[in-house]
Amino acid sequence: MLDVNFFDELRIGLATADDIRQWSYGEVKKPETINYRTLKPEKDGLFCEKIFGPTRDWECYCGKYKRVRFKGIICERCGVEVTRAKVRRERMGHIELAAPVTHIWYFKGVPSRLGYLLDLAPKDLEKIIYFAAYVITSVDEELRHNELSTLEAEMEVEKKAVADQRDADLEARAQKLEADLAELEAEGAKSDVRRKVKDGGEREMRQIRDRAQRELDRLDEIWNTFTKLAPKQLIVDEVLYRELTDRYGEYFTGAMGAESIQKLMENFDIDAEAESLRETIRTGKGQKKLRALKRLKVVAAFQANGNSPMGMVLDAVPVIPPELRPMVQLDGGRFATSDLNDLYRRVINRNNRLKRLIDLGAPEIIVNNEKRMLQESVDALFDNGRRGRPVTGPGNRPLKSLSDLLKGKQGRFRQNLLGKRVDYSGRSVIVVGPQLKLHQCGLPKLMALELFKPFVMKRLVDLNHAQNIKSAKRMVERQRPQVWDVLEEVIAEHPVLLNRAPTLHRLGIQAFEPQLVEGKAIQLHPLVCEAFNADFDGDQMAVHLPLSAEAQAEARILMLSSNNILSPASGRPLAMPRLDMVTGLYYLTRLEEGAKGEYRPATADAPEFGVYSSPAEAQMAVDRGELTVRSKIKVRLTDQRPPKDVEAELFPEGWQRGDAWTTETTLGRVLFNELLPADYPFINEPMPKKRQATIINDLAERYPMIVVAQTVDKLKDAGFYWATRSGVTVSMSDVLVPPEKAEIMERYEAQSDQIEKKYQRGALDHQERNNALVKIWQEATEEVGKALRAHYPADNPIITIVDSGATGNFTQTRTLAGMKGLVTNPKGEFIPRPIKSSFREGLTVLEYFINTHGARKGLADTALRTADSGYLTRRLVDVSQDVIVREHDCGTERGIVVPIAEKQPDGSIIRDPHVETSTYARTLAADAVDANGNVIVAKGADLGDPALEALLEAGITEVKVRSVLTCTTGTGVCATCYGRSMATGKLVDIGEAVGIVAAQSIGEPGTQLTMRTFHQGGVAGDDITGGLPRVQELFEARVPKGKAPIAEVSGRVRLEDDDRFYKITIIPDDGGEEVVYDKLSKRQRLRVFKHDDGTERLLSDGDHVEVGQQLLEGAADPHEVLRVMGPRQVQVHLVHEVQEVYRSQGVSIHDKHIEVIVRQMLRRVTIIDSGSTEFLPGSLTERAEFEAANRRVVAEGGEPASGRPVLMGITKASLATDSWLSAASFQETTRVLTDAAINCRSDKLIGLKENVIIGKLIPAGTGINRYRNIQVQPTEEARAAAYAVPSYDDTYYSPDSFGSSTGAAVPLDDYGFSDYR
């Protein structure tokens, strides 16, 4: 077998009959499979051992040679080679066809490649191939021309003979008629008898004339057809064809079926054809030119790569190895067989019958029919169902052909090449493990024993617990006591991977250090649940074991959960306290007024009370019951850093550990601050979830990961501890219904009655009434909510849970205790009947029924959304999978300008709300300079939180940053343009697969995006697409529904308004031609935008618009934006529009991820004029290739090609990728492979998918060449240590530890990797 690491590209082409015979180990002559009595393969059949190899290792068919010592001998009795049985997986056979057949992919695919090559319409081609018409393959023009006059004379003679014969017949008949009439007259017959005889005679004369005329016409037709006869001409009339061959057989040849196609191809001059097509393109117009372009694509493909078009017509069919189409015996003696065997059998049967018919010299019509059936059976083998009805097996099920084995989710590509099952893995239910550290997981003993079995066995032998591996295996299987100690030893320091399906982003697989636990459930650390999206209601997770040293190192350094605290999408921490932990910490840091032992300042008659010299003293008071953790106290602190303002006041030189200061706080807050790093400023406020998030964020920004990991672990422990002691529970008695509710409802009932009355009187129409009712009940619901809020005490558990941010929101509380309010029907419109009850009071039957609408729609939506979102992710991954960080800096000067703040009229600055997702974590492309010209942040700096704060303080409103969109790296991107990796908070590493990270970051929140298209408060307008469909629409670059026109020029607007449509005319500033937008529907409203005076109002007559500005509400068509504004603007437009959707759902994704995808959509150029280059006009080509070709041509003094940037949807862009392996495994497998084979495409194996398919290491991360090819030169000490002979009393045999032996996160910040760059 060939090793995948020894080739750099994979080429696909057309196989000729010789290739097929060369691969083959013998011809399959019989349709038999195996002998049903002996169960041995039949000789010369589809499973023949002579052709495909022996079924048993080192054993021939007849049993003469058995044993490995006869290796390579070919048995002289049965002809079987003595070798391994696994050759039956790789040896092919072939079937020699008695008549050539065409390959259905090239004839039937759209467009028909065979049709384009031969310039035949697919309909005609079908007639020829399936024996419904003859085609002229060649004409001897010269001979015909030379002998034309002779032939014409002969024809004239023949015609004259016919005419003479006719005249003679007529004459004879006329004479007979005259004689008959004379006779009748003599007999004195009646006149009607005479008339009858006369009519009869005339009728016969007419028939003679007609017959002669028909014969003359036929001769004319034969002559005309012959004189105009040309190759590739179809003759459907069989009689005509036979006449032609009888008369003029030596002047032309014709045939039907695939043979004729083969003959046409033999005479086909590719170079001449290509030249004439190029000429047509240069001079032609319209349809003719288009057709020539399409044909040239196919012709040029054959011309360029020396592929022979003869490969599209087969003389021999390959037979794939028998192990790939197995036949197995089921219990009960029946056989299950692969469909391919049935298809092959049909081909062989028909082929053998055809051979016999030809030998017998059967009539042509019978032979042709058999040839047609052979053609059909080969079609079914290659692609069943592509033409006509598919061949069905038992139970009317279409048989799976070779094409079906490659296609779709169950096909070879997606099922076996892109996803394989692996060993050293297991799965089990997960339960929570609150005692674990962040980098640990609990692994059930039995599971660990099975996973680590080989390691345990080896160790048992090393320690002499067992004599050999076999007995060690027995020990493990019987679970002897010493096995467990060995298992503990083996497991230490060996990380395992945990994965929860669906793996929507890269945090769906993380590494942990296993801790052995009793039971059969995997224990999971509570903080990683968010990343896995796991809960403990029966979820299962899979465990995988990294085996090699490299795999373990990668797992420990890159995948350990404590190194993956930040989200790769937004760079914000994912491992942060939730639910109970939040409640506990919130409880701990709340201040309770009037609690026991609270601080009282000194008065005239009493000293101050509740002052403590240290937190320890306060803790003693709590233990004695004199104080609670939530009472306000005054305490002296020495181990905790004061807040910034206090520090500046008390310790101008800076606080040192041990410096004392006092503050008014609660003991709970002091305890909370003890969980944070010692030099973190003291925080004296309650801690809801939002606040906790900002703290962890800040820690991630300013401290090493190892500290963050330890801190969140401490927060988790404290959170659970105090949640238990807070006594937060929910009971019916906590759900308080506000007493004012009845009065509020009465007031609004009255208002709604009024509306009803007006409606009854006819003062309002249906729509107005509904709108009014909706408005009234929305107000009522709000008012009940306010009353509810006021009515709840602060220590109510439900309010505590909501306020702390643990879970739930106020709307849910209102639903429980206040009123549910208005609900929507499945179309998304409000039902004007409110639900007046709360769940605490219980709903009426009607209310319950109305409520089920929305609830049920929610469930249906979620199910649909999950599938849609998964498919979107798949397309995104496919389009961006080869975007890998390839170099450190591409050196470009370009960048994009992003706003970071907005100047207010009073001169103050408001921070832009989207800085987090647009500017943060990028590299500056130019110095950021303030109003006085001072450089605040230098070019090339990384914009973290501190840098952004500095910019805002200096009053800078926008900065120029590097972006993926402007990166000039040929394949992939450079690290500087990409900026910081969101997941590590440092500049992205070379080899990082940023394309896949981007796809996952966009796809993972897809499920949260809403499905429905929004109605504007029940207004019957054009729906505005929102949510997931809008994201798909943008990435697929579709023309949006209800698209809004954009201004093509800057100028003044003239707005004309009739009853149904708007007409907008723009008068350009530069005095060019006016631009008119006609028939704009009134249902799309005019767009609101800022005018020169700073006010916002609708577009109106006389306004001034800038180029590219939207004129109506709705979405602009990205293709128009590209045409009017150019590629840069359309990129910005797409990024902004996608972000709009995600932001509206509160999802935070960094712009750079969307930019990576958008960059892939704009990578190609359509060639308008090819100049002196090789490009074909109208073809798509990579921008980099296009520019390189132009530079080359210009350097040689030629004419460069001109092109237009084109925006491709992600599906189209994936299919247009350079890698045919990647495209074929994505969609439309057969079409991609057909094209690739004709073009003789070569896959350079640059992206990830191609390498996964052929089984190489992917060229990303540590698989990239610069890391694969490192060689380490050991230092003298290292060499001495490596080659030392250890003695037994050395520490050599004590378990060596990596880092401290806690196995905590590796402090990567302490290692410099700069030498490897």
Swiss-Prot record:
Disulfide bonds: none annotated. Binds 1 Mg(2+) ion per subunit. Binds 2 Zn(2+) ions per subunit. Zn(2+) 2 binds at residues 890, 967, 974, 977. Gene3D superfamilies: 1.10.132.30, 1.10.150.390, 1.10.1790.20, 1.10.40.90, 2.40.40.20, 2.40.50.100, RNA polymerase II, clamp domain, RNA polymerase Rpb1, domain 3. Zn(2+) 1 binds at residues 60, 62, 75, 78. Pfam families: RNA_pol_Rpb1_1, RNA_pol_Rpb1_2, RNA_pol_Rpb1_3, RNA_pol_Rpb1_4, RNA_pol_Rpb1_5. DNA-dependent RNA polymerase catalyzes the transcription of DNA into RNA using the four ribonucleoside triphosphates as substrates. This is DNA-directed RNA polymerase subunit beta'. It comes from Nocardia farcinica (strain IFM 10152). The gene is rpoC.
